[in-house]
Amino acid sequence: MAGERERGGGHRGGREERDSEFVDKLVHINRVAKVVKGGKRFGFAALVVIGDQKGRVGFGHGKAREVPEAIRKATESAKRNLTRVALREGRTLHHDIAGRHGAGRVYLRAAPAGTGIIAGGPMRAVFETLGIQDVVAKSVGSSNPYNMIRATFDALKHQDSPRSVSARRNIKVSTLQSRRVGGDAEAVAE
């Protein structure tokens, strides 16, 4: 059994091979304490963002007595909570959006090529794992990493691609693209 793990055979080897497409970023580790009769029992909570850099991203939270175990649990939770986000030209957002969770608000703006990721802290990890290369983001209110991540995911959830907007409004994608500021009527919607 131990020999199989070292060689990469068996069930675990196949799972690791499949998961190699994902990039994960550790956003935050927090040491937590539980007060018991004999004193304090310490543990760790980890927040991880995972994505394939092609439009799929997820976040997870894990708690354990040791840091590596908390990170592993958070990574598994993130893999179960993957969502797909439509990207314009595979590098930025389709339009400006805002998201909110608790007292935290985030504002995300699409940016021209070459701008880079202008975002702070936890939001940067989301954009890097998502595959966004050009975005301007601002966080207002709570700077708690958990709330910032959830507010960012709330914003990304409300983004619409031109194809979904045109289907909802019963117009052609090319008509919608030509109305975009600086848009090209021949542009292909993703």
Swiss-Prot record:
GO MF, one example: rRNA binding
Cross-referenced Pfam families: Ribosomal_S5, Ribosomal_S5_C
InterPro entries the UniProt entry points to: Ribosomal_Su5_D2-typ_SF, Ribosomal_uS5, Ribosomal_uS5_bac-type, Ribosomal_uS5_C, Ribosomal_uS5_N, Ribosomal_uS5_N_CS, Ribsml_uS5_D2-typ_fold_subgr
Family affiliation: Belongs to the universal ribosomal protein uS5 family.
Assembly, per entry: Part of the 30S ribosomal subunit. Contacts proteins S4 and S8.
GO biological process: translation
SUPFAM superfamilies in alphabetical order: dsRNA-binding domain-like (SSF54768), Ribosomal protein S5 domain 2-like (SSF54211)
Identification of the protein by name: Small ribosomal subunit protein uS5
Gene label: rpsE
Known role: With S4 and S12 plays an important role in translational accuracy.
PANTHER family membership: MITOCHONDRIAL RIBOSOMAL PROTEIN S5 (PTHR48277:SF1)
